[in-house]
């Protein structure tokens, strides 16, 4: 397990591989509180599919797998498995609530093309 803690008071030897925004962490915390299960963590993953070849997925998980990278932010944990890690390194995971609706958004510098749906990409 790889652990990354994002906080102003902690200095890490390497830069965080992802940006997990305050808005995303706060929304995850709200959803976990609504579920009433403090052991839940947000798992972000990449799988084959979508109109551009790959698509993002989000789910709650209680378990941390051996190959997971764990990021702690504002009292919640973000999990990314080793296969997805290579496609998400450098990405920003955010939460937006605007005229287009409310959703988690990934800004991925590794994506060479994206689909209009916003959840499909290619590298």
Swiss-Prot record:
Binds 1 iron-sulfur cluster per subunit. GO terms for biological process: iron-sulfur cluster assembly. Its cofactor is iron-sulfur cluster. PROSITE patterns: HESB. Pfam families: Fe-S_biosyn. Keywords: Iron, Iron-sulfur, Metal-binding. SUPFAM superfamilies: HesB-like domain (SSF89360). Iron-sulfur cluster binds at residues 51, 115, 117. InterPro entries: FeS_biogenesis, FeS_cluster_insertion, FeS_cluster_insertion_CS, FeS_cluster_insertion_RrpA, HesB-like_dom_sf. PANTHER family: IRON-SULFUR CLUSTER ASSEMBLY 2 HOMOLOG, MITOCHONDRIAL. Required for insertion of 4Fe-4S clusters. Belongs to the HesB/IscA family. Homodimer. This is Putative iron-sulfur cluster insertion protein ErpA. It comes from Burkholderia multivorans (strain ATCC 17616 / 249). The lineage of its organism: Bacteria, Pseudomonadati, Pseudomonadota, Betaproteobacteria, Burkholderiales.
